[in-house]
Curated annotation (Swiss-Prot):
The keyword Nucleotide-binding does not apply. Its cofactor is [4Fe-4S] cluster. This is Homoaconitase large subunit. Optimum pH is 8.0. It comes from the Bacteria. Its EC number is 4.2.1.36. One of its GO terms (molecular function) is 4 iron, 4 sulfur cluster binding. Transmembrane segments: none annotated. It comes from Thermus thermophilus (strain ATCC BAA-163 / DSM 7039 / HB27). Keywords: 4Fe-4S, Amino-acid biosynthesis, Iron, Iron-sulfur, Lyase, Lysine biosynthesis, Metal-binding. It holds the Pfam family Aconitase.
Length: 418
């Protein structure tokens, strides 16, 4: 019986063939710690009377509340900088960007690696063929102290995307459709193994990041995109880093990209996904474009394309937060930033922004937000009764202009008949 991609990677780390269900101890190639967990991480290491065994394999990213929103956070971030300097640990400071975007830009996630992070969306690293998974402060501290971690080899779900995306449809729409089909608990502690076939292999690294990012919303332990397309040009992909044809899967799902339409996830569950056409017209107070899901340069360009020559509705706050300083620089160079500003957008410091509801756009009671992020749970961005609709940058931009949930195509049609 052949092996899945998850089994291949973990077998390579263990040094022998492993199967789903086995408990294994594996070498960790990179440990990622975010600012909001750093304090707990330090305390766990202190309790263990340990320091990072391989300092070069540990990165701390100040992104969740950046810049500091209050004195308490400012003190915590000061401690991060001092601790990093004291132990020779790499610290990506305020403004560098969202942890997952930064690690991939910096080459700190590579095909075949095991990357553990103190953020649930560490599945994003699977876009480049790495086994990325999120863990709590204790497990992260143990991984940093020992250079290893333990886990149960996950079963795998095979998700096959075929064809090419139609005009106006994005990888975010494909990712939301995937979560709808798998359901919120349909891949609990499984590796979602994504195959791109019959034209789908043309998806960019950024688009693959969106797919891998959202696998955790189906409960996934890891989200692994089988290397193809531009990944083969950008990285040195080992010959062994492919699933076997006779690998065994817990379930299989197939999605025809060419048949997709714009999607939206409706409060308060990510898998509550509908066609935008079914729920359009909902009045919007805030639109947020950014995060580790959709804050890359292609996302900002897609939004700018919709916003060019238009203005944001008077009652809408449009917040755009680039996923990294590199993205911000590219947007400034090619005119994307100017287009966003001319439309009425407010540009935030590269990082997580208002995604988790701690600063930079907290929602008031009863407010509605269209967001390109990955979670719309009750209270996620502020008030418990505030509503978050998850959508693509194109749908988010069109909704900002219209003042209600809509698509660029619907917006254009209404403008023609106005």
């Amino acid at each position: 019986m052949g092996q899945t991609l998850a089994e291949k990677i973990l077998s390579h780390k263990v040094g022998r063939p492993v199967r789903a269900g086995e408990l294994v101890v594996v070498e960790v190639d990179q440990v990622m710690v975010v600012d909001s967990i750093a304090g707990s991480f330090f305390k766990r290491l202190e309790y263990l009377e340990a320091t990072p065994r391989y300092p070069e394999r540990v990165s701390i990213v100040i992104d969740h509340v950046a810049p500091a929103a209050n004195l308490e956070v400012a003190k915590a971030q000061k401690e991060i900088r001092e601790w990093g300097k004291r132990h020779g640990i790499r610290v990506f400071d305020v403004g560098r960007g969202v942890c997952h975007q930064v690690l991939i830009e910096e080459g700190l996630a590579q095909p075949g690696w095991v990357v553990v992070g103190s953020d649930s969306h560490s599945t994003t690293y699977g876009a480049v063929g790495a086994f990325g998974t999120g863990m709590g402060a204790t497990d992260i501290a143990l991984a940093a102290a020992s250079g290893r971690t333990w886990l149960r080899v996950p079963e795998s779900v095979k998700v096959v995307f075929r064809g090419r995306l139609p005009k106006g449809v994005t990888a975010k729409d494909a990712a939301l459709e995937m979560v709808r089909l798998l359901t919120a608990e349909g891949a609990t502690y499984m590796a979602v193994e994504i195959h791109l076939l019959d034209g789908a292999e043309a998806l960019t690294r950024g688009e693959r990041m969106t797919l891998a990012n959202l696998t955790v919303e189906a409960g996934a332990k890891a989200g692994l995109v089988v290397p193809s397309g531009e990944i083969l040009e950008m990285y040195r992909v080992p010959d062994w880093l492919y699933p076997d044809p006779d690998a065994r899967y817990a379930k299989e799902v197939e999605i025809d990209l060419s048949a997709l339409t714009p999607r939206v996830s409706v409060p308060f569950y990510v898998d509550n996904v509908h066609e935008v056409a079914q729920v359009k017209g909902k009045r919007v107070d805030q639109v947020f474009i950014g995060t580790c899901t959709n804050g890359r340069i292609e996302d900002l360009r897609a939004a700018a394309e919709v916003l060019r020559g238009r203005k944001v509705a008077p009652w809408v706050r449009l917040l755009v937060v680039p996923a990294s300083s590199q993205v911000l620089e590219e947007a400034a160079r090619d005119g994307t930033l100017l287009t966003l500003l001319e439309a009425g957008a407010t540009i935030g410091t590269p990082g997580c922004g208002p995604c988790m509801g701690r600063h930079m756009g907290v929602l008031a009671p009863g407010e509605v937000c269209v967001s390109t992020s990955n979670r719309n749970f009750r209270g996620r961005m502020g008030a418990p009764d505030a509503e978050i609709y998850l959508a693509s940058p194109r749908v988010a931009a069109a909704s900002a202009v219209a003042g209600y949930l809509t698509t660029p195509e619907e917006l254009e049609e209404e403008e023609v008949h106005a």
